[in-house]
Amino acid sequence: MSKRPVIESEKPAWHDEDDDNMVVAVPKKVKMTMRVELKRTTDEEHGELDSKEYVGRLQEAFRKRHGGTPKWAKAAAGDEEEGSLLKTAAGYLAKDVNLPKTTIHTTLIKDFNIGHRYTRGITVVKFHKTRPVLIVADQGGNVQLFKVSREVKKDRFLQSANFSKFPIDSLEIADKGHSVICSSSRKEYLMQYNMETREVTQLKPPNTVPKQGIRLFAISHDSQFLAIAGHNSHIYVLHATSMEHITTISLPANASEIKFFPSHSREIWIICETGQIVIANIGLPGTKSSQHTFTDDGAVHGTTLAISQHGDYFATGSDTGIVNVYSGNDCRNSTNPRPLFNVSNLVTAVSSIAFNSDAQLMAICSNVKDNHLRLVHVASQTTFKNFPERNGKVTHARCVEFSPNGGYMAVGNDDGRLHVFEIHHFTDY
């Protein structure tokens, strides 16, 4: 029997056109272990999917459950005739992209920002969504752009801007990727920097927003809305371009962190200093805003939050170092959701949390102690024991983020150091 390599692009032996038009109703009540894997927070209320989407979710859930494609499900090289007859429409030859839970292979890129390092603490690291660029902001009012590429070995610096007497606390990418907007707790206005024209613009909130320093703000994914956290337990929602005041959200306490839901420009998730979580919907013109509130499990003082790209997971951090990971669906639908799991490796206040694009990997850090940076394998609910390396030192990590496809992770530190790691399992930027 002749041998040949199995080709992934081969077509199934038959194709039923009725399968393409089939609509599948996703059950509203499923087991906890399957709920996150099959349902999406962006699904319509009736929960109907086309067959291709449903099959894709089943396959993804299976691979996550079993830590990859099991040996019996992988095709081996065999007879051409035999292979063409036995192959089914299920597409079992999909590439295994699941992250192993035992060890993670990373490389620290040495001297990433050599020649362009400041001594002021780095407060924000952001990867551009469509261009291989890392954006770094610090308490000296500096915004720097670096090229992210395996081909670039030396000078990765692209450009920078400095805002005098404007220590940056928050930064968001705006204008559909063309600009960044920065805020400072010492100033009552925002600064916008156009990365293409290098123009700098001062953005003043309207008079309906109290004049106060802006430590914290967020921008929706479509750059339509901008939310500013006030000092009086309020969130002020503005049009990002006109700065028109749209609505005000009242909170049980001051906000520690705010984020727009990744795919819903009118939905804001907030963690309060006292541990309450508020999910607020801005509402359409002429309608009232609505909100849903619950208390983070075991939290006394909330510090930060993160939402996975598809909203399947929601993570919170507290001053005790505990990170709770919830199902996004549970948070929406329950007034007392229970975490899927929690991570207790940090013993000091959590400063930042980030999910990679497919939510297989979560990074958590604290800027109170050296080397308080951990990587979590989400499916197995465990941390990688080989990260960070014993001989490596990450000083007082304040902020962390993954590149769009997970190939890189950036960590900003209080002493101005910038650490950029290659995550070898994910080869793309």
From Swiss-Prot:
**Gene3D superfamilies from the entry?**
YVTN repeat-like/Quinoprotein amine dehydrogenase
Tell me where it resides: Nucleus, Nucleolus
Q: Where does the record place its WD repeats?
A: 117-156, 295-336, 345-386, 392-428
- Which UniProt keywords are listed? Nucleus, Repeat, rRNA processing, WD repeat
* GO terms of biological process kind: rRNA processing
Task: List, alphabetically, the Pfam families matched.
Answer: WD40
Disulfide bond residue pairs? none
Q: Which GO terms describe its cellular component?
A: Pwp2p-containing subcomplex of 90S preribosome; small-subunit processome
- PANTHER family the record matches: U3 SMALL NUCLEOLAR RNA-ASSOCIATED PROTEIN 18 HOMOLOG, WD-REPEAT PROTEIN-RELATED
Instruction: Sum up the protein's function in the record's words.
Output: Involved in nucleolar processing of pre-18S ribosomal RNA.
For this entry, the protein name equals: U3 small nucleolar RNA-associated protein 18 homolog
